[in-house]
Amino acid sequence: MVKETVTVAKTCSHCGHNGHNARTCLNGVNKASVKLFGVNISSDPIRPPEVTALRKSLSLGNLDALLANDESNGSGDPIAAVDDTGYHSDGQIHSKKGKTAHEKKKGKPWTEEEHRNFLIGLNKLGKGDWRGIAKSFVSTRTPTQVASHAQKYFIRLNVNDKRKRRASLFDISLEDQKEKERNSQDASTKTPPKQPITGIQQPVVQGHTQTEISNRFQNLSMEYMPIYQPIPPYYNFPPIMYHPNYPMYYANPQVPVRFVHPSGIPVPRHIPIGLPLSQPSEASNMTNKDGLDLHIGLPPQATGASDLTGHGVIHVK
């Protein structure tokens, strides 16, 4: 039995034709070139090397557009642009953009005002409503940040270690916040009320009323003085008259005058000095009612009286 040998024609990997291989192919790419030890040797002028570095998160079809963008940014070197991007395994250690990304990841510490607002929201809304606390009380933080801050706060409170620890923002507890609010309310209630602006300045007596001051100074004559009836004029003496141009002898009842002592002691009422104009008529009526006459002279000598009775004697009828 004779074995038949079957010869299979070789197919070129470059052009796809049979009868030759890629090394001896004269069609397409390897025209006028020879491949020696895996390297194509061609008589064509030397071209700039193509950048074949693998980009991260990019498809191979967009490499040309990316190179054009890198050249337009001013780098001018496509190889340097590819090296700057790096690979996935490199991370952001050797990348120029790594420092910026690392700074963005760095958190911003909480301030004391934010922590106190967090305590107020925790007191009103309770545990678990981190979204409501972030929305209504700590608007500068996200709900995730509020939840993380609350977790650290409760861990700090539950630690029973009595060793000296560094002062932290979490040492401000909810009881301290309530005590601060209570002290602020007490301070606001102790402030004196504002007096209305008027033309007359009122006396300021702190902690004492007028009755208390009067009781304290009981021995002083603080009552109103009684008004006595003036003496009527006799024997055509002119009565005391008012002098309108002199302020001592009259008082204007239309304008009340209030005197205030610096110690707060009330001052007695002002009493006008003088006599009314209708006083002479009242005095004449009083003289008519009394009926007293005063005569000075020698009395009439009675008959049969001794000389001892002849001396000057004043008789009142």
UniProtKB/Swiss-Prot annotation:
Residues 102-158 form the HTH myb-type domain. Probable transcription factor involved in somatic embryogenesis. Acts as a positive regulator of BHLH109. InterPro entries: Homeodomain-like_sf, Myb_dom, Myb_dom_plants, Plant_Stress_Dev_TF, SANT/Myb, SANT_dom, Znf_CCHC. PANTHER family: TRANSCRIPTION FACTOR KUA1, TRANSCRIPTION FACTOR MYB1R1-LIKE. SMART domains: SANT (SM00717). GO terms for molecular function: DNA binding; DNA-binding transcription factor activity; zinc ion binding. Keywords: DNA-binding, Metal-binding, Nucleus, Transcription, Transcription regulation, Zinc, Zinc-finger. One of its GO terms (cellular component) is nucleus. Residues 94-108 have a biased composition (Basic residues). Residues 130-154 bind DNA. Residues 185-206 have a biased composition (Polar residues). A zinc finger (CCHC-type) spans 12-25. Its main location: nucleus. This is Probable transcription factor At5g61620. It comes from the Eukaryota.
